[in-house]
């Protein structure tokens, strides 16, 4: 881990001002840890990070050193674990979370990494529980999808 950090910092420090270049960082065993674009010592554009076993860990875009836009996160066996939007390095908008077979188990609205809006829990394709959050605090919970959609004036959220 220490070697990884040293290599990563040295790669970022070698970036000439204003010039964009492609960077690769490796684990101590020689496996790739991450790769992507660097400009003005900050991550920009598309990046891929890898687990120590070589499987993709996460991938997405950076802007001015912050995670931006849509990202995918994977388990160390390559299964999709979660996906959603970042804004200035914080999770925002809808995020989806998956089980090991690739089924959605949870969707949640986030604002600056905090639950803010609706969170839906699934079993198969059915919503089994819904909650509404405000600034990370649960405000209400429903276990009946029909009642939930009616009380909140919502259409199909599946």
What do the PLM-derived regions correspond to, one by one?
Residues 4-158:
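Glycine/tyrosine- and acidic-biased, solvent-exposed loop/turn segments at the edges of beta-strands
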